A protein has these predicted regions:
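Amphipathic alpha-helical polymerization modules
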Residues: 2-30, 52, 172-262
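Cysteine-poor, low-complexity segments in flexible/peripheral regions
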Residues: 24-188
Length: 262
């Protein structure tokens, strides 16, 4: 993936380093990957009045990718001990979105499971004492999500606005989750399921983002090829016209024109 991000063109110039086409855009140290380019986008003149981009900043292609579902993200607290699994959720009413963070807290008393929803941004209660059933759907502030399984007493889940996350960070999270020992750890299997569920969605979003950028680049390259083809055709026409003009007997042509004017 880093090799792809450090791709070069046929001149050996890096495609995703902004204006710094001689600088490798992404530098890797273990699992840490830093962007070393800038935010520039190189342009080429395709006509007297128009320019087209021939590069993209690597930060825009590989790092500015919204995590979660693109609007908000869900997460299980790493200290949860139950088997509650939360999905990525969806937006059901964009006009009700607040951009606040919410927390879903579970209580289990005498075998009955309830949950409270708290807006942790404002510190206010959204709802309390809600009865929980398996595969429960929860709606809050224009968002909808589901939790299945059996959350334990004290387990909690968060819902917060999506933020930019690089595709490298997403892959790193998956690797870390898979390498973390789970034997004998309460809720470890459920914790892994929650992490993989979230990060696989992030991978999907990352691939969609990169493919969209690739499509845009391909469209620009195709337009440049088309303009080159049109320019070549015009060159041929100009050469033919020039050849015809060079073959004209100008003395005879002037004489004929004068006779026509008499």
């Amino acid at each position: 993936l880093v090799t792809l991000a450090n791709s070069t063109d046929d001149k050996g110039q890096f495609l995703f380093s902004g204006y710094q086409d001689n600088t490798k855009p992404f530098v890797q140290s273990g699992m840490d990957i830093q962007y070393a380019g800038d935010q520039g986008q190189r342009l080429t003149q395709v006509s007297s009045s128009r320019q087209l981009a021939i590069s993209d900043a690597g930060a825009d292609v590989f790092e500015r990718i919204k995590n979660g579902n693109g609007v908000f993200k869900t997460a299980a607290d790493p200290l949860n001990t139950g088997t509650g699994i939360i999905d990525v959720g969806s937006v059901i009413d964009p006009t009700s979105l607040t951009g606040d963070q919410d927390e879903i807290n579970f209580t289990v008393t005498n075998g009955a499971t309830t949950f409270d929803v708290v807006n942790t941004t404002t510190g206010t209660s959204v709802s309390a004492g809600n009865a929980y059933t398996n595969n429960h759907t929860i709606s809050v502030d224009g968002m909808q999500l589901s939790i299945k399984g059996e959350p334990a007493n004290g387990d909690k889940f968060t819902v917060s606005p999506s933020n930019n996350q690089s595709i490298f960070e997403t892959v790193s999270k998956i690797v870390t989750a898979l390498e973390t020992p789970s034997s004998g750890q309460p809720g470890a299997a459920t914790r892994l399921t929650n992490i993989l569920g979230a990060t696989l969605k992030d991978i999907e979003s990352g691939l969609e983002h990169v493919l969209a950028k690739q499509t845009a680049i391909g469209a620009r390259l195709q337009e440049i090829d088309t303009l080159d083809s049109v320019g070549s055709d015009q060159d041929i026409q100009f050469q033919q016209s020039l050849a015809e003009l060079q073959g004209v007997d100008f003395a005879k042509a002037i004489s004929d024109l004068q006779r026509q004017q008499l």
